[in-house]
A protein has these predicted regions:
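Peripheral membrane interaction modules
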Residues: 1-198
Length: 198
């Protein structure tokens, strides 16, 4: 998992692509006060128009140039998808806690989406509910959701993954033990996308 320069959170829900989708981006470099902020990028861009309905999920990468910068977009078009809302609870771990990085992917698109990174500032303790920066992802209804974790107590870093088979509705739970470092419980709430054809 990469540590990007900019961590963008959201969208809170998936975007149903039935009409043109416009992304609006405004990035600023923070100054000491809000009036000292400097514009880095101001962009409104139309999502690549898929003039056909693909039968397989695909990853679309496109660059957009604004007056002051170029932004690289990466968009996953997930076919026949359901929405997965993920939550994480720490069942056990070291007394001083651990640092964690959480990501999700599908088995067809191996591109990981960062759900949360505690860095070296936020320690997770037994009993904690981890507040994910991003908790909603889209998954093919016939595929698998793969949640991966990289956990560290400061001296050792270990990884683990947990797979979930999607449902149209309902809740799935599963536990992940990362060697002797920690045990986590994942809860995934499944739902269909709701959209109007008008």
């Amino acid at each position: 998992m990469q540590n990007p320069y900019l961590v963008l959170s959201g969208p809170v829900r998936g975007v149903v692509y039935t009409a043109p989708v416009i992304f609006e981006v405004r990035l600023s470099v923070r100054g000491i006060t809000e009036s000292d902020d400097k514009e880095l990028s101001l962009l409104a861009a139309r999502l690549v128009n898929l003039s056909y309905n693909p039968l397989e999920s695909l990853l679309i990468k496109k660059s957009y140039t604004s007056r002051l910068s170029t932004l690289d977009f990466e968009h996953g078009n997930i076919v026949y998808s359901v929405e997965a809302t993920i939550s994480v609870k720490v069942i056990s771990g070291p007394p001083d806690g651990f640092y964690g990085e959480f990501a999700a992917a599908t088995d067809s698109l191996k591109c990981e989406i960062l759900l949360h990174s505690s860095g070296f500032e936020e320690r997770h303790l037994a009993g904690d509910e981890i507040k994910l920066s991003r908790s909603v992802v889209s998954v093919e209804s016939f595929g698998k959701l793969i949640v991966s974790v990289r956990a560290s107590d400061g001296s050792v870093t270990l990884t683990g993954t947990k797979k979930f088979r999607p449902l149209e509705k309902g809740i799935t739970t599963g536990r992940l033990r990362i060697a002797k470092l920690c045990q986590l419980e994942f809860t995934v709430a499944w739902s269909l996308f709701s959209y109007s054809g008008t």
